[in-house]
Amino acid sequence: MNQALSLNPNLFQPNWKLLQPEVQKYFVENLFSLAIIQKQTRTQITMDLLYNQLSTKEIPFITDLLQENLPSVLRTTCYNDLGLPFHVEVRNTEIGHLFEHILLEYLCQNKIRKGAKRATFAGRTKWNWVRDPMGRFHIHLTCGRRDADILSPALEQTVSLMKIILGYDSKPLFLLNTTTAQNGLKNGERRC
């Protein structure tokens, strides 16, 4: 009997395409694209910058913009190599890392608005421009399917703020002489 089962390769073979999470793709003007996969307990976002601005170092007014539009993001916890608080790190951090922190803040705000007493979400932004195209960030969040109802509005809010930040002035916001590392990892967390 066992032998007969093993001879049939299609028996008990799941359709892997049905088990794979759906990738949602978004293009944000000429600024960046997002490929989002929401899993049971986490969300993966691949962010591709569509221009050569890689760092907030090239946006000297970044702290003022955040203070005006989302001051609470400056209080998010940041785990970086130098141990800098986010309100300092934000002056010279990668665009993908900034996106992560803004999204974490909006996730917390939306969860509390929905009725939660507390909210904690963590994120990790990685990049490796030796392996991947320059400007690609891999963002992992502790926001799974149970929070699917707050992810979509948080993404919309994050994209709106990123459009303000990256399109603040019609002049080029980037310097050709950037000193961003070819690969790296940064983590963040927001507790409300």
Q: For each of these PLM feature ranges, what is it?
A:
Residues L70-T142:
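M16/MPP (pitrilysin/insulinase) zinc-metallopeptidase core fold and M16-derived inactive scaffolds
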Residues P21, Y26-K39, F61-E68, G115-H138:
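Catalytic zinc-binding patch centered on the HExxH motif and its immediate surroundings
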Residues F121-C192:
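Metalloprotease/metallohydrolase-associated module, dominated by Zn2+-dependent proteases
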Residues I59-L74, E156-S170:
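A common structural junction motif
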Residues D48, Q53-E58, E100-H101, E105:
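Long, Pro/Ser/Thr-rich low-complexity/intrinsically disordered regulatory tracts in eukaryotic proteins
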